[in-house]
Amino acid sequence: MAECQDFAQFGLAPNLLSAITRMGYTKPTAIQCKAIPVVLQGRDVMGGAQTGTGKTASFGLPVLQKLLPLANTSTSPARHPVRVLILSPTRELADQTAEALSNYAADTPIRIGVVYGGVDIKPQAEALRRGVEILIATPGRLLDHLEQRNTNLNQCGIVILDEADRMLDMGFLPDISRILNALPKKRQNLMFSATFSPEIKRLAGNFLTDPVVIEVARQNATAATIKQEVFSVNELQKTDALVELLKTRGEDFDGKPLQTIVFVNAKLTARRLARELEKCGFNADAIHGDKTQEERLKLLKDFKDGTLNIM
């Protein structure tokens, strides 16, 4: 199904359709058109998709649809085992995925949990012991919970590797292998990656069974919504050039600052640049690995809310 007009044609339940309508979803994206029917059929999937293509809904909606017959309002943890596991490379992606799935499932009793490192493990353990049907996790923290027996994966029937290329880049392959060995052999496997590198294909060969390959963006392509321009600038003039660019292009038609992300190659550079931009009158802050998880989440929230303009 390469072309589709609306979500109703997938046979999704009314409570899922009403939730995505509230979220402003109208016409499915290319990967949603291709992936949702295949996931509903129970096939393994190897999906290639860039950021901003609607990837989360392409697996989140059919997975929720498949769980609905098992959904219940019981308070017994035994009635809410982990049935779907979504592995994410970072805390931020795990949070974003959990938020999206919680919105899709808002009109259902399906429980969704998220666990990652850098924060207190006790509240996560308590939530897991109460039971969750869908668990979004970073590999290392999930292994911590499995070792502490806060949860088990004995009834997990669907496993999703999200942004698998990033997980390999970050050295998570040994952790992923340990997790996969703890899962039932009979399960549905979905893997999504921005690229189909040789390493990803090797992982797919070990992880997926007769997968349907879905690719909606050219390998190594930039998301279609991004316009690329290159400016040749002397090393010593880069900050001045950036300031000039922000002054000339950093506002919308009403004169309000546009949300801007500036990437640099080092934490020290990020801190220095944020200070320089603040001195020039811009509302800027730096995000990097030396900040605590709470600081990073607050900064991301401020950027999302528009309280912070340049990150």
Please name every model-derived segment.
Residues 1-311:
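Conserved helicase RecA-like core
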